[in-house]
Amino acid sequence: MKYVDVILPLPLDGTFTYSVPDGMEGKVVPGVRLLVPLGKSKKYIAMATRLHDDKPAFSCKPVEAVLDNTPSLLPQQMRLWQWIGYYYMAPLGDVYNAAMPGGLKSTEKFKPKMELYVELASTYRSEQALHVALNLVQRALKQAKTLTTFLSLSHWDSLDGDTPREGIKKVTKEELMNESHCTAAVVKALIDRGILFTYELEIGRLNTNGESHLDLIKPLSLAQQDAYNGILMQMMKKDVVLLHGVTSSGKTEIYIHLIRKAIEEHKQVLYLLPEIALTVQIMERLHRVFGDRLGIYHSKYSDAERVEIWQKQLSDHPYDVILGARSAVFLPFKALGLVIIDEEHETSFKQQDPAPRYHARSAAIVLAKMYGAKTLLGTATPSMESYYNAQQGKYGLVELKTRYKGIQLPEIQVVDVKDLRRRKMMSGPFSPQLLAAVREALKNGQQAILFQNRRGFAPMVECKVCGWVPKCKNCDVSLTLHKSINLLTCHYCGYTYPVPTECPNCGSTEIMGRGFGTEKIEDQIAEIFPEAKIARMDLDTTRTRNAYERLIADFSEGRTNLLIGTQMVSKGLDFDKVSVVGILNADSMLNYPDFRAYEHAFMMMAQVSGRAGRKGKRGLVILQTKNPNLPVIGQVVNNDYEGLYQGILEERRTFHYPPFFHLINVYVKHKYDKVCEQASHELCKTLRSWFGVRVLGPDKPAVARVKTMNIRKIVIKLENGIDQQKVREYLKFAQQQMGKDPRYGALQIYYDVDPL
């Protein structure tokens, strides 16, 4: 009797064992999907991981069905799942759920998209027979018109004897009905006469049109060519290379040349981007060159589309290039040769909730090593960890210090808004310098971007008389005002509350919004520049599938000229006519209670500043802050990444933070705050007995209650080189001990490894 270990799509640790019936032995191999029972009545699609003869000590149920003829998961993917589960301390079932499209986990069989085609019956495929067919329908005018239209569309009307002069073209039933303006009944009548017949073809849901045109790849500039050669040289010695190139230096063009080289060597490429918005612009550039060799994969695609991409990657003719966001790292590859991670510093590459809380950059580097492939990290503002690894010689380093075609870096003007408010010179959140710059840009037919990293109308509303602030009933946060839907909304759980007309505490009607989000910026700037064509890019305006494409296309083509947005607008977007960028509130990024605050603020401001000044014109950035003398502000103005790095590095070394130490955040959650507090202290005491002063906490996080669950956080600082396996064994043991205590039956414990 054979047995198989499987992963179930449930948040459960480890694998489960089932017996393999005799008739299935040759079909059950690692990587195939199996239908298995669980409990009394439930059935799941499980992933086979290991076939063996080791009879378990317990009675196990048999596999009910094998759903694949060939594996849906390749060995390298299986190893990646196991690494993610181990390193990020996530149940394998959670990894399975994150990795596989829903259609491959459903008991309902995936249905390919079919199209109905119309064809001429074989009886009438000669010149003489066609005349007979036309005579048959000459009195049925609609049928005659439809048949004539079909013969023209399909080229059957160009017979030379019994052979068409042109190749026969497939005609869909829909196309025939549209061109002949007929109904389905007319087509059916021609079928009933035996003149036409219909058949189905799988057409797929993906746009695979377009041949590749590698000849359209532009030649590199001297600086780009030097960087390209440097990357190839470094890749001869290192598995991972960091390309540190200033904004607008033409890194994408270098990527395209590297992709071409990989394709010529019959290798596949994985090109990761942090945001779906970025894939829209890059996709157009890559599609012009690589055509149907390019596949796109991200969460805005339907489940059926993602299944089709997955299955194509397993076919004999997979995509040569996959462009995608975080989840694309899970796709199957048969011959992966190069991984490109653009904007590698972006926090969007880190999955937060739900588990697994993996970092796509780290996962992609591990995946590349499994294939013997090379990894290129590209950015204008490297993460501290990546730059440190490059400085230490673990990664190769190539620098590109000039913008493409000699375009200057933007001029950055720092505006002290505290001083301007004191002198009553501010117009809401706008300084006179910013308004003047935007006015000039619009007057000259240029465009402007206003950056505010907070969506909604106002972060909170408050009673002016008694100070009452409406809070979420499920979370420990104030509600955000969204004026467009006239609701107060929680950005953590989605709870909504009507905008109050009077204070429930004191009865006052003086209730007003505090602070400003992108929605309020949009309202106020429209009052100042009524002639401006304004667009807003944030989570609220990009929920639908094509929203990104529409917003970016409108701005690129000049249908809008003033773009307001959150961090989405900072991520590598390329707009020719943007001459002004306004950073409305630098302090909101700088004052965040996190050791990475200055690093992230510098990256955000440097990236959004890089959107200004392209195609031969120097841009202008207005940076508004209450603290103009902070060192990080000067570093942004001078584009001094090295200064930022050296300053922060010493602090990190002194206080035991990355890149010198690894962090693991341990979260304890419970419905009752008292139980949460007690359990977190007990867990912390246990961890301290093993890890000593490496353990900090427990503390309440910035938001200590989410979706009715109270939260405590314990931080563990682990020096580089420590035995990671031992650490994980200790943590799992401590969690198991807590689980045995009847007081903590409903307690949740989870981990965030290398948190951002």
Each PLM stretch: what is its role?
Residues 685-710, 731, 749:
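A carboxyl-terminal module marker
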Residues 215-221, 225, 237-677, 685, ...:
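Inter-lobe coupling/hinge segments of SF2-like helicase ATPases
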Residues 478, 533, 694, 746-750:
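Residues at or immediately flanking beta-strands
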